[in-house]
């Protein structure tokens, strides 16, 4: 994977890393490869004054994981790239050895996330894509889809609205590949609460839903003008 990714661009990370940790340019020397206390091998710059990893460097673990980028106070900081033992790749900003800021994560399975991180997990706004062409664009919190977003499926179906802990939950609009449309409340990925369902053939139902089914009070209208208002079970 490291050969496929190519050389890491240290120049791109200089400005951001210096702003985060200005001392990383102080008294830096290039050290020969050495093993740090917790086991990995470090190759790169070193703070002579602080006796710590600082500046540009690469760290290699026994399992083959490799991190290249900026260091300060013995921790990854600024822009860096990690390729783990399984071939998963992250390139982006770091703070105190954690993904923090904007970055791109590509799993060995082909899933890709591009967006914001906080303390090692997706948090903020991002885009996630899968090999089957599914795509999510929206908000994340604590590593989960949370807030407003849009999920698109390869068959042309899409959902735009609220998510809670990775589930469709709250208010949103779902458009099926068949062009049926539902606007309303959701719970645990199911139509649940008040909503409006319009079919491609012109039928329309407005009323209560329970776990994807019409249940409670509602009104169903047909294209020919007929309608029914009442209770559904």
Which residue stretches match the model-derived regions?
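Intrinsically disordered, low-complexity repeat tracts enriched in Gly/Pro/Ser/Thr and acidic residues
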Residues: 1-233
């Amino acid at each position: 994977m490291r050969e496929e990714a190519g050389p890491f661009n240290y120049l791109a990370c200089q400005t951001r890393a210096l702003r985060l940790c200005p001392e990383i340019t102080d008294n830096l020397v290039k050290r020969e490869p050495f093993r740090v206390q917790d086991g990995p091998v470090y190759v790169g710059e070193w703070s002579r004054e602080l006796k710590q990893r600082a500046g540009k460097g690469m760290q290699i673990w026994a399992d083959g994981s490799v991190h290249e980028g900026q260091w300060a106070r013995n921790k990854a900081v600024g822009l860096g790239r990690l390729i783990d033992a399984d071939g998963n790749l992250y390139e982006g900003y770091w703070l105190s050895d954690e993904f923090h800021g904007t970055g791109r994560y590509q799993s060995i399975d082909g899933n890709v996330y591009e967006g914001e991180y906080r303390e090692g997990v997706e948090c903020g706004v991002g885009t996630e894509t899968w090999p089957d062409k599914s795509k999510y664009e929206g908000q994340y919190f604590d590593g989960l889809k949370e807030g407003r977003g849009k999920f698109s499926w390869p068959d042309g179906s899409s959902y735009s609205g609220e998510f809670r802990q990775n589930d469709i939950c709250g208010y949103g609009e779902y458009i099926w590949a068949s062009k049926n449309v539902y606007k309303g409340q959701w719970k645990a990925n199911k139509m649940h609460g008040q909503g409006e369902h319009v079919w491609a053939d012109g039928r329309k139902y407005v009323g209560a839903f329970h776990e994807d089914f019409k249940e409670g009070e509602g009104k169903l209208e047909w294209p020919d003008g007929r309608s029914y208002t009442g209770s559904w079970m």
